[in-house]
């Protein structure tokens, strides 16, 4: 076992002790093989004069208070010479400023044209913040790169895809934006940041469902099989399609079938599977799940046809079509049109999906095949990967060289940003302890940089906590933590972050809070990237129940070593880690009883 752990450490993956009863070991190989090499194994040419000029200008910018002086590990990222680089950037590691300086080095010292460079950030909000930082630093460098050029450079995945969709797919409208008057068709946001279906979207899905029920007897049969209801009497007029709620095993909530179809279809496409090509009979699933998938295929075909008639596309559909056209050699997607993707810097890479990986592969394979130099810098932290329920996975970041192969025997450069400038040591160590049972992760040695103020502490569990009974005590505690932040002259913009998994829980708590208190409330997913002097968590991070259908889909897609259930068990612990690492000098966690992510803290 010691040899196995040593070998796993060399690969950057934590070995899983089978005696822990964690299910399938992480060493299980996905069926998907590495494709032919895309990236040059040769280093990017950087002269000593270029490096020296960058170091000198950074020193002047730091002296002027424009930026902080980079650490040695940050300099390694800024000056990296490899065309294919993976950066493990831990919580609070200063990656955003480092990313800005890397872009400045490329634009101002390596003379990369802004028209050949794209920086991908997670949401429109994070893009806006990154653009603002980049413009400020470029101004100090007296660069001619202006706000318009920076706006073109810094995008979400969906915004970058949208540029190609407008040029090649006929400027489609987006299904995800139906009914959203604030949405921008030219700047689509990452749907991971979005909410529930709106009325216009639900109506279109419902119409497709009703049409299938009316026109397809097999579909009708599957619907009644799934709902456990009697099919309509063939001697009588056909009733409307049933709208009773349906709960798929593994899902938390019941919903009308058309909503459940849409949710699972999004997941299926996100993990790189084309719904119409799914070999339902070959999947290792139950008869009920097979009936669900067969009905889904009929529904999805009708839904896509309805979208086409209205000039609409889903984001997933656009990624699929563009990837297929790139692979097929569509002349409208030549090297000139793709030039902006030549040099890619992608933040939050731990949250990409197989579908995004397929698109990135197709982009860079097409460019490299045309003789265009390409580079990819992927920045992420597998410890903060929390979107597996939408199809994303840290496995894609950890098995990076399989998906983004270099030519010959080359491998990606691997750099680590392990200093934590945000949280005090007790908070960091408590957060790390939560991850002890994560089956598949990159081991890191995080160093705490911030000194601990008087009264600081790691995670304090408050248990038993019943929201219905103990709300007044929680309100008093929140006020006390705001006073603590004031007493130590906290420099944080927010004194207290109130965190939970569900909006309804947070709204109930906020209803009784003094609105003048410096408190902000977010779901844990929305709080990623934020920080406050004190983090207060009001949820246990328990994994969801077993999801047999998604286990079967995970096994079929060929991208993953883990089962979906194992991925979700790991993700529930990572969610706890993300929540704790929002706190700077104190964390309080209110739970009914120690379980899930809080069990190890009790």
Where are these regions (language model features)?
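Conserved RecA-like helicase ATPase core segment
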Residues: 354-457, 580, 588, 601
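P-loop NTPase Walker
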Residues: 1-173, 577, 581
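C-terminal accessory regions
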Residues: 545-550, 555-602
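Conserved helicase NTPase motor core
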Residues: 51-91, 153, 285-399, 419, ...
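A short beta-strand element within the Helicase C-terminal
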Residues: 522, 526-555
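Helicase P-loop NTPase motor core
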Residues: 92, 96-99, 410-412, 419-519, ...
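Conserved ATP-driven helicase/translocase motor core recognized via long
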Residues: 39-42, 203-298
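Conserved P-loop NTPase-based nucleic-acid remodeling module centered on helicase motor cores
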Residues: 116, 121-246, 395-398, 523, ...
């Amino acid at each position: 076992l010691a040899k196995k752990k040593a070998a796993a450490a060399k690969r950057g993956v934590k070995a899983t002790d089978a005696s822990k009863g964690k299910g399938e070991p992480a060493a299980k190989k996905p069926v998907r093989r590495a494709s032919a090499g895309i990236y040059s194994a040769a280093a990017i040419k950087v002269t000593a004069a270029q490096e020296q000029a960058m170091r000198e200008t950074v020193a002047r910018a730091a002296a002027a208070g424009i930026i902080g002086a980079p650490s040695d590990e940050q300099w390694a990222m800024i000056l990296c010479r490899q065309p294919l680089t993976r950066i493990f950037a831990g919580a609070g590691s200063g990656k955003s400023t480092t990313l800005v300086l890397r872009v400045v080095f490329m634009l101002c010292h390596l003379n990369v044209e802004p028209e050949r460079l794209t920086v991908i950030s997670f949401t429109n909000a994070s893009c806006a913040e990154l653009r603002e930082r980049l413009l400020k630093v470029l101004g100090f460098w007296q660069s001619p790169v202006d706000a318009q050029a920076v706006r073109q450079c810094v995008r979400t995945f969906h915004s970058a895809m949208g540029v190609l969709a407008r040029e090649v797919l006929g400027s489609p409208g987006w299904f995800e934006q139906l009914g959203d008057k604030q949405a921008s068709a030219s700047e689509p946001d990452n749907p991971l940041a979005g909410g529930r279906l709106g009325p216009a979207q639900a109506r279109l899905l419902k119409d497709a469902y009703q049409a299938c029920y009316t026109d397809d007897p097999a579909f009708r049969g599957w619907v009644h099989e799934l709902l456990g209801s009697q099919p309509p009497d063939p001697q009588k007029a056909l009733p409307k399609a049933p709208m009773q709620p349906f709960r798929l095993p593994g899902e938390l909530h019941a919903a009308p079938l058309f909503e459940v179809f849409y949710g699972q279809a999004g997941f299926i496409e996100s993990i790189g599977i084309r719904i119409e090509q799914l070999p339902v009979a070959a999947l290792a699933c139950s008869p009920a799940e097979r009936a669900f998938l067969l009905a889904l295929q009929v529904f999805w075909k009708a839904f896509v046809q309805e979208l086409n008639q209205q000039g609409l596309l889903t984001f997933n559909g656009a990624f699929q079509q563009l990837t297929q056209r790139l692979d097929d050699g569509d002349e409208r997607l030549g090297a000139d049109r793709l030039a902006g993707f030549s040099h890619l810097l992608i933040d939050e890479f731990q949250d990409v999906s197989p579908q995004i990986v397929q698109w990135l592969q197709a982009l860079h394979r097409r460019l490299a095949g045309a003789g265009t130099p390409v580079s990819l810098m992927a920045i992420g932290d597998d410890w903060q990967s929390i979107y597996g329920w939408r199809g994303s996975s840290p496995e894609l970041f950890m098995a990076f060289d399989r998906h983004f192969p270099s030519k010959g025997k080359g491998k990606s450069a691997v750099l680590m940003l392990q200093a934590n400038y945000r949280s005090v040591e007790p908070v960091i160590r408590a957060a790390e302890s939560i991850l002890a049972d994560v089956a598949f992760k990159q081991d890191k040695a995080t160093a705490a940089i911030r000194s601990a103020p008087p009264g600081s502490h790691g995670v304090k569990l408050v248990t038993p906590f019943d929201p219905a009974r103990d709300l007044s005590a929680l309100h008093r505690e929140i006020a006390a933590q705001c006073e603590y932040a004031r007493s130590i002259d906290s420099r944080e913009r927010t004194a207290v972050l109130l965190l939970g998994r569900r909006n309804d829980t947070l709204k109930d708590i906020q209803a009784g809070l003094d609105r003048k208190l410096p408190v902000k409330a977010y779901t844990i997913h929305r709080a990623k990237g934020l920080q406050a002097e004190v983090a207060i968590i009001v949820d246990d991070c328990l994994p969801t129940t077993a999801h047999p259908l998604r286990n079967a889909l995970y096994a079929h897609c060929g991208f993953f070593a883990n089962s979906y259930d194992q991925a979700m068990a790991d993700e529930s612990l990572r969610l706890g880690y993300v929540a704790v690492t929002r706190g700077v000098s104190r964390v309080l966690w209110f739970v009914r009883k120690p379980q899930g992510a809080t069990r190890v803290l009790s």
